[in-house]
């Protein structure tokens, strides 16, 4: 499926096994550039290459794992969702492509997939200090519902806000 991402056209499609390492590279670059609130933890790879292979293997249908590709076919972003409960749990765009509407294109495609699976609501958790992501989600119609999730990662407490959108 082609989606207009604002300044350029981006293709959004289901991820394949061949995309696994590119998905990992997008994640690492996005985290290094955007998760400054995690300090040193964000500056080193968080997952091994085989973890990305497993992510793709675990997210075949009916689960949703979509990639956005640029003009040359390179993976520039991705998102993952669980249609059983409407959770959108990953959305990353390579920082070199930030601000071009790729995140919006991925969100739209994920919403379409969730709707097709019968979901009436989408939700996600994002770090309370991830202001850029919160702004993108809120401009797409997500609203904070007051729920908070805390977890530990690398000795750091991660506090995430839940936001929801009616589909």
Residue ranges of predicted features:
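Acetyl-CoA-dependent GNAT
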Residues: 2-3, 14-20, 24-96, 104-109, ...
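Short, well-ordered coil/turn elements that cap or connect secondary structure elements
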Residues: 7, 60-61, 139
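Extreme N-terminal starter segment of soluble prokaryotic enzymes
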Residues: 9-11
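Short coil/turn segments at alpha/beta junctions that flank glycine-rich nucleotide-binding fingerprints
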Residues: 34, 100, 117-120
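Residues that scaffold the ATP/ADP-binding catalytic core of kinase and kinase-like folds
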Residues: 91, 100, 145
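Active-site acidic-Proline motif in GNAT/NAT acetyltransferases
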Residues: 94-100, 128-129
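Short polybasic/polar patches that bind polyanions
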Residues: 98, 115, 138
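C-terminal "cap" of GNAT-fold acetyltransferases
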Residues: 120-134, 138-167
């Amino acid at each position: 499926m082609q989606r207009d991402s604002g300044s350029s056209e981006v293709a959004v499609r289901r991820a394949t096994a061949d995309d696994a390492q590119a998905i990992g590279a997008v994640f690492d670059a996005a985290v290094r550039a955007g998760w400054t609130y995690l300090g040193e933890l964000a500056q080193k790879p968080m997952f091994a290459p085989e973890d990305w292979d497993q992510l793709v293997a675990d997210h075949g249908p009916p689960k949703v794992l979509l990639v956005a590709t640029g003009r040359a076919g390179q993976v520039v972003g991705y998102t993952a969702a669980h249609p059983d409960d409407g959770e959108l749990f990953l959305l990353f765009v390579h920082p070199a492509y930030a601000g071009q509407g790729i995140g919006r294109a991925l969100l739209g495609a994920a919403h379409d997939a969730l709707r097709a699976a019968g979901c009436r609501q989408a939700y996600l958790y994002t770090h309370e200090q991830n202001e850029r992501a919160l702004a993108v989600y809120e401009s797409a119609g997500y609203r904070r519902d007051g729920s908070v999730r805390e977890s530990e990662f690398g000795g750091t407490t991660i506090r995430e806000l839940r936001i929801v959108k009616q589909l």
